[in-house]
Amino acid sequence: MPRLPLLLLLLPSLARGLGLRDAGRRHPECSPCQQDRCPAPSPCPAPWISARDECGCCARCLGAEGASCGGPVGSRCGPGLVCASRASGTAPEGTGLCVCAQRGAVCGSDGRSYSSICALRLRARHAPRAHHGHLHKARDGPCEFAPVVLMPPRDIHNVTGTQVFLSCEVKAVPTPVITWKKVKHSPEGTEGLEELPGDHVNIAVQVRGGPSDHETTSWILINPLRKEDEGVYHCHAANAIGEAQSHGTVTVLDLNRYKSLYSSVPGDLL
C-alpha cells in the first residue's frame, strides 16, 4: 500500500490517542459565552491581577496575598501565590488563604521592607509612579537601618536598699549591640562615661530579643540600691548602619533619712 493512503488511515486514531480531537473545545459544563449574562463583577482588591473564569468568559478576581481561596466558591490565587489550607478556625472545609510561594521578607529598592516578594510586586503594581524607576527587590531579608529607641529608660526615685531597674527597647537591622553607661563626675569637675556593670557587684545587665521582630530589649538591674548609684544612666545601641542613645535618671534617698523625715511629720497630717 502506498505510504500516503496508509498515513491518512492512521491519522484519526493518532488524533484520538493524543487528544487532538478535543483540542479547542470548551469545558464540558461551559455553555457558549454570553458576556452580557455574566454577573456584575465585584470590585477587585487588586484589579491588575484579574482573570477569566474556568470557561474563559466572565471576569473574575484573583486573590491577593491573605485573601480566602479554595472551596466551591473561593477565588483562585494570583500569580506567584498558592492556596494554603487553614490551620484551624470556622472557615469552610477545603478553603484556605492565598500565601506567597516564596516565603521570607525582602528589601525593596525603595528602602522599605516587605513581608514577601509578592507584597513587593503588589506595591510595584499599585503605585508605579510613586517610585523613581522600577520598584524591585534589592536583597533578601529586611532592609537594614540604624537603631531607633522605641522605649527609653524612665526616671526612677527610690530609697536605699531597694531593687530597681531601667529598661531600653530598640529596633534595628542588623541586631544592635546595647550597652549601659553611667555619667561619672571627677573631683576636677569633668564628666565621663563609665561602662556598666564594670566592677559593681550590685549591678547586672541583661539583653534579650523582642518583644517584636527586629527589636531588642535590655535591662540594668541595681540591687541593693545605694546612694552612690544615683545619677544619669545612658542606653547606647549601635550596629553597622548607625547608633542611637537615650537616658534615664536614678534619684536615691537615704532610707534612714527618709524614716526620720516621715517620723517628724505630725500625726494629724498623716
From Swiss-Prot:
Signal peptide (residue range): 1-17
GO molecular function: insulin-like growth factor binding
InterPro entries registered for this protein in UniProt: Growth_fac_rcpt_cys_sf, Ig-like_dom, Ig-like_dom_sf, Ig-like_fold, Ig_I-set, Ig_sub, Ig_sub2, IGFBP-like
PROSITE patterns (UniProt xref): IG_LIKE, IGFBP_N_2, KAZAL_2
Domain Kazal-like: 87-145
This protein's record includes keyword Secreted: yes
Entry keyword annotation includes Secreted: yes
IGFBP N-terminal domain span: 26-101
Annotated GO biological process: cellular response to tumor cell; regulation of cell growth
One Gene Ontology CC term in the entry: extracellular space
Keywords assigned: Disulfide bond, Glycoprotein, Immunoglobulin domain, Secreted, Signal
Top-rank taxon: Eukaryota
Disulfide bond positions: C30-C55, C33-C57, C38-C58, C44-C61, C69-C83, C77-C98, C107-C143, C168-C235
UniProt domain Ig-like C2-type: residue ranges: 147-251
Glycosylated sites: N158
Compartments where found: Secreted
Pfam families assigned to the protein according to its UniProt record, in alphabetical order: I-set (PF07679), IGFBP (PF00219), Kazal_2 (PF07648)
Stretches assigned to coiled coil: none
Function: IGF-binding proteins prolong the half-life of IGFs and have been shown to either inhibit or stimulate the growth promoting effects of the IGFs in cell culture. They alter the interaction of IGFs with their cell surface receptors.
PANTHER family found in the cross-reference section: INSULIN-LIKE GROWTH FACTOR BINDING PROTEIN-RELATED (PTHR14186), INSULIN-LIKE GROWTH FACTOR-BINDING PROTEIN-LIKE 1 (PTHR14186:SF16)
Name of the protein in its database record: Insulin-like growth factor-binding protein-like 1
Native source species: Mus musculus
Gene transcribed to yield this protein: Igfbpl1
